[in-house]
């Protein structure tokens, strides 16, 4: 149990998808204007990562891995296309659920919801799972932890962005300029976790 807790903490803080690896920056910067929208997208990313990483782990272990289906046959060259297909299917299902049960969040996320399909944070989580050879349970923990870390970062950025509306930001830095500086400072803060050995 201690191993899974340390894997979760590591994926949230030490190896944060957004602030350590800078993955998923397109939606991270675009949807960080309001805390409510950022929180909704963060939940969507947690759900997609929490399902996509373990599902792709099963696909990789039982179909694509060397000698998984038939002795001597290696289908790992199909990793990218297969993982993207699984992620796209999961995002499509999530999009239908949000449209039916949470229409306000669906409309607020707009074009960025389908973009989760090609969000490199999702694909990065799956790639890290393969590279690190996680088991199914480790994949579940890692997927949920990585999604939680990404959500933590985007909600924090959205909160700071909302507060900056009342700040006297120099004209040349308004908009993305101050956002990039803020993200850089947040990443510096998360770098302090990099020395922790779990």
Swiss-Prot record:
Cysteines paired by S-S bonds: none
A GO cellular component entry from the record: plasma membrane
Chief subcellular location: membrane
GO MF annotations in UniProt: oxidoreductase activity, acting on NAD(P)H, quinone or similar compound as acceptor
Keywords associated with the record: Cell inner membrane, Cell membrane, Ion transport, Membrane, NAD, Sodium, Sodium transport, Translocase, Transmembrane, Transmembrane helix, Transport, Ubiquinone
Membrane topology field: Multi-pass membrane protein
InterPro entries given in the database record: NqrDE/RnfAE (IPR003667), NqrDE/RnfAE_oxidrdctase (IPR050133), NqrE (IPR010967)
UniProt entry tagged with the keyword Cell membrane: yes
EC number from the UniProt entry: 7.2.1.1
GO biological process terms held by the UniProt record: respiratory electron transport chain; sodium ion transport
Catalysed transformations (reactions): a ubiquinone + n Na(+)(in) + NADH + H(+) = a ubiquinol + n Na(+)(out) + NAD(+)
Keyword Transport: yes
EC category: translocase
Annotated family: Belongs to the NqrDE/RnfAE family.
Function statement: NQR complex catalyzes the reduction of ubiquinone-1 to ubiquinol by two successive reactions, coupled with the transport of Na(+) ions from the cytoplasm to the periplasm. NqrA to NqrE are probably involved in the second step, the conversion of ubisemiquinone to ubiquinol.
Quaternary structure and interacting proteins, as annotated: Composed of six subunits; NqrA, NqrB, NqrC, NqrD, NqrE and NqrF.
Protein name per Swiss-Prot or TrEMBL: Na(+)-translocating NADH-quinone reductase subunit E
Record organism: Pasteurella multocida (strain Pm70)
